[in-house]
Amino acid sequence: MSIYKDINIASAKPSLKERKNIKHYALDCLNIDEKNNAPLFKTLLEDAMKVSQKEILLIVGGSSFYLKSILEGLSSMPKLNNDQILKIEREIATLTNPYAFLKSIDPNMAFKIHSNDTYRIHKALEIFYATHTPPSEYFKKNPKKPFEHAITLFALCIEKTVLHNRIKQRTKNMLDCGLIEEIKALYTQYPKDSQPFKAIGVKESILYLEKQLTLKELEEAIVSNTIKLAKRQNTFNKTQFNNLYVGSVEEVRHAILKRSKSGIKE
């Protein structure tokens, strides 16, 4: 979320003071109506690596799916402008059953994707609409390019009650700092189907602005959805990454400092 301009409260974007003390990358790169994706994440990471040279780089945040995609390798994607992307998004949105449609145009690709994996189904359909080629055929012609740099993976393990309390406090802080006003200004300015409007904290605020939630219900919805997301992220990290170091905040901090002193580029 921090990649988007003007979403500061909802993304808990680092303050100017924090950015002054520690160099941050990939902040404020996209307008609200532009699309974020794994290839862009990879490009921004590579740009940061070029600039940082011998400095230690930390990739932080909840984008574990993007990170996994980069480590396993990405195929080059069709080059599309924003208007083309929005047109494809709308075409996919008209499908009654996206998975059934994918199965009809590319049974081989559909076989590799679970029917509930909406993200991968969506990406496959994007390729089809952009190239008019079955995704499996497209990937044969555009094989994955693996990430060629050493990387060490860390994940925080926080006791459930402590984590839930932090989520509740963070939600309260966002609301106190003007979350609703921030989203209201953006929602009146940009297309309603913009990608950031689907994010937790943002989508609930929109429901509040549309008078579908009370203020109390808004806060409860953000807390509940964030807790569910944290659980999914934890499961994903533990099941999808090998050699993952899991520990408390202090343990992870100590491990990162130890590895940074050894000169490993992370």
Swiss-Prot record:
Gene3D superfamilies: 1.10.20.140, P-loop containing nucleotide triphosphate hydrolases. One of its GO terms (biological process) is tRNA modification. It is an enzyme of class 2 (transferase). InterPro entries: Dimethylallyltransferase, IPT, P-loop_NTPase. It catalyses: adenosine(37) in tRNA + dimethylallyl diphosphate = N(6)-dimethylallyladenosine(37) in tRNA + diphosphate. GO terms for molecular function: ATP binding; tRNA dimethylallyltransferase activity. Keywords: ATP-binding, Magnesium, Nucleotide-binding, Transferase, tRNA processing. Coiled coil: none annotated. Its EC number is 2.5.1.75. It comes from the Bacteria. Its cofactor is Mg(2+). The keyword tRNA processing applies. The record marks S63 as: Interaction with substrate tRNA. Monomer. Belongs to the IPP transferase family. Catalyzes the transfer of a dimethylallyl group onto the adenine at position 37 in tRNAs that read codons beginning with uridine, leading to the formation of N6-(dimethylallyl)adenosine (i(6)A). This is tRNA dimethylallyltransferase. The lineage of its organism: Bacteria, Pseudomonadati, Campylobacterota, Epsilonproteobacteria, Campylobacterales. The gene is miaA.
